[in-house]
């Protein structure tokens, strides 16, 4: 109804057909469902990355340890998701992608997530309501978290020691509200206290292995480090990192950026047909 009201009279130039149906036709949903089912039988499958025996990703206790697809015992949940977007995976051999293309715009988009001091523009922000949608490690929501993987809304309560989640490092003294979260959360969100390797800038130790806090007085990533433009910092304290490779560094002359390949707004993949985002 909203679409019909806003642009219901728009027509395709090639044949004059309306973009929005002028009459209600429930059959179209059946046609769409049949088409989606047909796609699921065309050889597409979820992208997986083999588990790293040297750096195993700790699975939640309720996750089956059988081999995929009966469990996640032989895959790395973090890299199975992250590698599709950071340029680490190869698009031509990825059976999850149904439609995608290479685009330098995505690489340039990551420029907004890096702080000014580290060569970025620092102004990208993710709202708290999106952060709250990410699940806990065992698949529960933050509103129904378990005693084993609790959600702690008190920002002042901090983690103790650092924790390795496969090759991903959750540093010590990070607010507990960011612990016990799903692999997708860590692959997608730059949160206060997140570890940024920026390994390609390794010739200058002051530009690698950083933690950004996004607080007012954080001279690296807060308003205190925004430089001449006070808008060049994350107002929410969260930045998107989904397309950022651990090696990436925008620091001028001190690193490089690996080409992330997926076009915006996001690709159509087998995941979108079979799983919630």
Where are each of the predicted segments found?
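Extended, leucine-rich alpha-helical cores of fungal transcription factors
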Residues: 1, 269-270
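Conserved small/polar residues in nucleotide/adenosyl-binding loops
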Residues: 271-277
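An aromatic- and glycine-enriched ligand-binding surface/loop that stacks and positions planar moieties
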Residues: 4-231
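Active-site beta-strand/loop architecture of penicillin-binding DD-peptidases
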Residues: 221-268
């Amino acid at each position: 109804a909203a679409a019909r009201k806003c642009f219901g009279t728009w027509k395709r130039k090639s044949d004059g057909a309306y973009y929005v149906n002028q009459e209600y036709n429930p059959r179209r949903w059946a046609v769409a469902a049949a088409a989606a089912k047909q796609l699921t039988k065309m050889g597409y499958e979820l992208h997986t990355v083999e588990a790293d025996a040297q750096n195993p990703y700790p699975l939640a206790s309720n996750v089956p340890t059988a081999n995929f697809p009966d469990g996640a015992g032989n895959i790395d949940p973090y890299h199975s998701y992250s590698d599709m977007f950071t340029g680490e995976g190869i698009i031509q051999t990825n059976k999850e992608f149904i439609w995608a293309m290479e685009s330098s715009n995505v690489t340039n988009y990551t420029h907004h997530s890096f702080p000014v001091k580290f060569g970025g523009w620092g102004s990208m922000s993710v709202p708290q309501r999106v952060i709250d949608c990410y699940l806990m490690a065992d698949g529960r929501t933050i509103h129904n978290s378990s005693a084993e993987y609790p959600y702690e809304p008190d920002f002042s309560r901090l983690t103790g020691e650092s924790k390795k989640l496969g090759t991903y490092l959750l540093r010590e003294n990070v607010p507990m509200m960011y612990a016990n979260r799903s692999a997708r959360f860590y692959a997608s969100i730059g949160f206060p206290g997140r570890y940024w390797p920026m390994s390609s800038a390794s010739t200058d130790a002051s530009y690698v292995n950083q933690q950004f806090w996004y607080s007012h007085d954080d001279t690296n990533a807060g308003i205190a480090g925004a430089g001449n433009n006070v808008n060049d910092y994350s107002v929410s304290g969260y930045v998107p990192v989904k397309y950022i490779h651990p090696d990436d560094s925008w620091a001028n002359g001190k690193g490089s950026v690996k080409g992330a390949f997926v076009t915006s707004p996001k690709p159509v993949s087998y995941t979108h047909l079979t799983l919630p985002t």
